[in-house]
């Protein structure tokens, strides 16, 4: 992996998203400005960490970061805008929620939303840039908790296990029980379950 070279600036925010692929729930984003004086060991892409490690880092990031913020786009916004534009909107909301304005923003992936400060997309940034790793952890822990809460309301779908992704089990239950109000109606499997597919 090529080592990432930081822009010459002080306040750098990292931004990442979780939940573009699921059929249900919001896409959740986070923006984080880390404190160089309070380093956090073990930051990595949230998908490469155990749940226990993620939860511990989640608390440490919230405690030690100079600023952090969550953003989201709800299922109805995803359906209205499409998932890419909804993700960009959620990222803008996360950056806008920071109580310290960053001088530069690093975004995981290959596209940047329009922001009031310079920004750069970093491919595989969640493994290369600690600020993005921290954002990925905050976003994933938050979204996983939302799926666990939804699982209590709709236990038949298994949301706590698959987090809303289109697993065989989820698709089977979608066909059996239909869609909840939290499902993304613009996504193919949900459309088919609702009989809306053309």
Swiss-Prot record:
The keyword Hydrolase applies. It catalyses: Endonucleolytic cleavage to 5'-phosphomonoester. GO terms for cellular component: cytoplasm; ribonuclease H2 complex. It holds the Pfam family RNase_HII. It is an enzyme of class 3 (hydrolase). Gene3D superfamilies: Ribonuclease H-like superfamily/Ribonuclease H. It is found in: Cytoplasm. Manganese or magnesium. Binds 1 divalent metal ion per monomer in the absence of substrate. May bind a second metal ion after substrate binding. InterPro entries: RNase_HII (IPR022898), RNase_HII/HIII (IPR001352), RNase_HII/HIII_dom (IPR024567), RNaseH-like_sf (IPR012337), RNaseH_sf (IPR036397). Residues 10-198 form the RNase H type-2 domain. Belongs to the RNase HII family. HAMAP family: RNase_HII_B. This is Ribonuclease HII. The gene is rnhB.
């Amino acid at each position: 992996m090529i080592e990432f070279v930081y822009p010459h600036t002080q306040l750098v925010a990292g931004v990442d998203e979780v939940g573009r692929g699921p059929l249900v729930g919001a896409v959740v984003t986070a923006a984080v400005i880390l404190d160089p004086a309070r380093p956090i060991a073990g930051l990595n892409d949230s998908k490469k960490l155990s749940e226990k490690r993620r939860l511990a880092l989640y608390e440490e990031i919230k405690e030690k970061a100079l600023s952090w913020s969550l953003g989201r786009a709800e299922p109805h916004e995803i359906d209205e805008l499409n998932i890419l534009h909804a993700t960009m909107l959620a990222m803008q909301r996360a950056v806008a929620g920071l109580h310290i304005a960053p001088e530069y923003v690093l975004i995981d992936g290959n596209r940047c939303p329009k922001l009031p400060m310079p920004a750069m997309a970093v491919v595989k940034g969640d493994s290369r840039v600690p600020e993005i790793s921290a954002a990925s952890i905050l976003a994933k822990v938050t979204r996983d908790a939302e799926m666990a809460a939804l699982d209590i309301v709709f236990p038949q779908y298994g949301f706590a296990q698959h987090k809303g992704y289109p697993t065989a089990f989820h698709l089977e239950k979608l066909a059996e029980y239909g869609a909840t109000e939290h499902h993304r109606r613009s996504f193919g499997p949900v459309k088919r379950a609702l009989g809306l597919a053309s």
